[in-house]
Amino acid sequence: MSTQAGGRLVRREGYRVIPDKNIYIPPSISPEAKALLGALGQAKTYAMEFPAPDDVVGWEKMYEVAEGANKEKSEKALAASGATVTELEMGGVVVEDIRPHGWTDNGKVLVYVHGGGYCLFSARSTFADAAPMAAATGLRMVSVNYTPAPRARFDVIQRQIVAVFDALIDEGYRMSDLAILGDSAGGAMSASTVLNLRDQGKGMPAAAVLWSPNTDLTSPDDSTVTLDPADPILTYSTLLTTGAKAYAGDVALDDPRVSPLYADLSRGFSPVLIVVGTKEMLLSSSVRFYQALEAAGQTAKLDVYEGMWHVFPQYDLPESRVAVAKSAKFVTDHLNQ
């Protein structure tokens, strides 16, 4: 898409211009990452105009637009992976049951909670995000098609994810046979799921992997402000705020039910790997959650990548392949203990 006309930015329907974005391309990242970052930086000159947090009809229209935009990418990833994907209902919740190419049943399952600012995308349209971990782990993956906000608020969405775990337990799995992966908003919801399972006395998954999690909806913390101009994916004044409010509804944004950073982590948490890049606004969110977990005596690892951006493991980059391999090893090591 062209972002300029006669040397000036032009308005596009449904978008607003962000004149202060300055996407620096560091020499320290791979050539592949440099090329993609350049393309992302050009596209980020514009930001989509999102509906008000309580505008259900407006968000449904936006949801359909996002689904259509992601459809081809998801279908290509599915075809390239050779995985088998079946739509099922588990605990009253629709899921995509992913069996990677060459899958053999080892009695373990990785549950995936997709991102999308709490309001966008589905389990089907985010297959490209799930595919790398399916291939790297060789595990059966169950991607949860939760109801997006504001059609559902945080409590309904979290109950849906817990219901999928309950259904897996009913199938005969133990909690120690299960792990959870989430990215962005899905990373925050994955953390909340661990806490909900713990608080309901159901145990906790053997491992949790969180890619670029949004653990504190109150923001702005340091990187939310300082990295806003440099982030090629997120903009604080758009989805990062409106999506959070749509998800939380009438609940305060610092409520631990929506911001897991403020939860009582001393009572337990799954062994967790947090993956984040230095070029994303949620860097502070990841660092702070890691420090809170460590201070509470939990097993936590923070894996930070030079020059990488929001949920970078989903891309086909050298840095992404390293992050996915380490994420997969973390999951399989803990599932096999």
Each predicted region: which residue ranges?
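A glycine/proline-hinged amphipathic helix-loop "lid/cap" segment
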Residues: 1-103
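Short beta-strand-to-loop junctions in surface cap/lid or active-site-entrance loops
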Residues: 94-108, 261-266
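Short strand-loop-helix active-site module centered on a catalytic nucleophile
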Residues: 95, 111, 133, 154-217, ...
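Short beta-strand element of the alpha/beta-hydrolase
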Residues: 106-116
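Catalytic nucleophile-loop/oxyanion-hole region of alpha/beta-hydrolase
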Residues: 122-123, 129, 142-177, 315-322
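Hydrolase active-site cap/lid region
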Residues: 195-254
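Short beta-strand/loop motif that positions the catalytic acidic residue
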Residues: 268, 274-276
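Catalytic active-site module of serine/aspartate enzymes centered on a nucleophile-bearing elbow/loop
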Residues: 316-337
